[in-house]
Amino acid sequence: NKEILTRKFTTPLTTAANKLYNVTEFKAEDLSSGMDTNLRAYLLSEYDANGDGLLSQAEAESVTEIYSTGFGGKVKSLMYIERFPNLEVLVVNSNCDELNGITLSNNKKLTRVSLSPANGLWSSLNVSGLENLTTFELKFSNDQANLSKINLSNCPALKKVVVEGAKSLETLDLTGSASTVEMFWLQSCPKMTTVDIQEMPIN
């Protein structure tokens, strides 16, 4: 009847529906969810454009640079870093000595990766297939580093490779990457016996 048709709702429709179907209140997607606490705080401070305490898809796509100077403490994990498809620069220095795992092969726009000290890294590091990567720097500061393999294959724009203090490093794969390297620095890596640098343009 007319009374029902003209009646105003005093309870928001979404709230009423939630009660009817016994579901929790809908929340917008947060692409910073589950990330390392200090890294998440940094991302929200730099890229949360509307200040709602969440990272929307659009805000995640605006992330192009991550610098450790903005972190409030140490970063133990870079899990979910693949959520930022436009990330170009990743620099985590002095805050990542407990960093234990990282995969960057899905961040296709990366041009620079710098991690120091990365003492907690696991046995292997995959940075392969990054067509825009020009600079890779990885440094360790103690004798307990367990990293034994670095995969830098198929990075055709690579110009600078720096690896220091990787006491357990045995394999550095530069297949499909070596021909463009202009600076290659390998220091204090006693278990590293062979590196194929035939493609490198070294005089």
Residue ranges and their predicted role:
Residues L138, Q144, L172, T180, ...:
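Intrinsically disordered, low-complexity linker/propeptide segments enriched in Ser/Thr/Gly/Pro
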Residues I102, L125, I150, V163, ...:
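Periodically patterned hydrophobic/aromatic "hotspot" residues that form packing/interaction faces
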Residues T64-T69, L90-V92, I102, T111-L115, ...:
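Conserved hydrophobic beta-strand positions in leucine-rich repeat
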Residues N1-L31:
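Extracytoplasmic cysteine-anchoring/structural motifs
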Residues G72, N93-D97, L115-G120, L138-N146, ...:
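Extracellular beta-strand-rich, repetitive "passenger/adhesive" scaffolds
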Residues E29-K108, N126-E131, N154-P156, K167, ...:
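N-terminal capping/linker segments that flank leucine-rich repeat
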Residues P12-V23, L87, L110, L133-F136, ...:
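Short, surface-exposed linear segments at secondary-structure transitions and domain or protein termini
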Residues S123-L125, N146-I150, T171-L172, V195:
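Beta-strand-rich extracellular passenger or scaffold domains
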